[in-house]
Amino acid sequence: MNLKRKWDVYSRLTRIDRPIGTLLLLWPCLMALMLAAGGMPDLKVLVIFIIGVVIMRACGCIINDYADRDLDSFVERTRSRPLASGEISTKEALILFVILGLSAFGLVLLLNGLVVKLSVVGIILTIIYPFTKRITNMPQMFLGIVWSWSIPMAYAAQTGEVPMEAWWLFAANWCWTVAYDTMYAMVDRDDDLKVGIKSTAILFGKYDRQIIGLFQLAALACFIAAGWSADRGLLYGLGILTFVGFSTYQQMLIFDRERAPCFKAFLNNNWAGLALFVGLGADYLI
């Protein structure tokens, strides 16, 4: 395999070619750093967390594809993934996972002891998540914990502690993650039923849109609580209102439960997260 071909395989394995997951991880992480710092976070901490988010998202994709390698070939959206298609060996994928994981851990060692301890838990959660799809109908709820774990880590890095304010943001992001990843699971629902992969899209059944809406409302309430506990003002409120607008649009997209619109609704959450981040940043700057 030549270098260009290997890069193509690695970029698809780690989803470098599809940054949506990285962005969905990044917005709440940056919000946590800003809230913890009361504005602009420490530059060293900021750089470490941005790089760490990119690396850990890649790690999560690798271990997810490793866990699903025997099933992905039966799912329309995933059958061309490198492990499922045999373009890369499981050994090579696991070696890359270890290298990236150690790189992320090396970055964390530049921070305080509490962050290091939390990072160990985060790595364990990342490894466990893909296998929850085999044993529970609620893997999205476990994913919500994994994808929110950078929030207490960000507070710990910036302040040396994890106050109640952090857990409001954690709860908001957990609810939001369950909502948008259920939209994502709606895309694969028919294939997942055939191969035995479990998801909240299957669990919620005909009430999927309504329950997603409840999680969106819960996320909204917790985002408001996080802002209130940090004394945020009008511009953050405008970010919240924009988030509501995007959430409403997503409900319209998933109304008929068709694959393409459901995937579009999932992707639209990037803009919802960006709106919250920009609103919070503007509230501190202006």
Curated annotation (Swiss-Prot):
Coiled-coil residues: none
GO cellular component: plasma membrane
Topological relation to the membrane, as annotated: Multi-pass membrane protein
Membrane-spanning parts: 21-40, 95-115, 142-162, 167-187, 210-230, 235-255, 266-286
Keywords: Cell inner membrane, Cell membrane, Magnesium, Membrane, Transferase, Transmembrane, Transmembrane helix, Ubiquinone biosynthesis
Pathway named in the protein's UniProt entry: Cofactor biosynthesis; ubiquinone biosynthesis
Cofactor(s) this protein cannot do without: Mg(2+)
Subcellular location per the Swiss-Prot or TrEMBL entry: Cell inner membrane
Biological process according to GO: ubiquinone biosynthetic process
Reaction catalysis annotation: all-trans-octaprenyl diphosphate + 4-hydroxybenzoate = 4-hydroxy-3-(all-trans-octaprenyl)benzoate + diphosphate
Similarity comment: Belongs to the UbiA prenyltransferase family.
The protein, known as: 4-hydroxybenzoate octaprenyltransferase
Organism per entry: Shewanella baltica (strain OS155 / ATCC BAA-1091)
Record gene name: ubiA
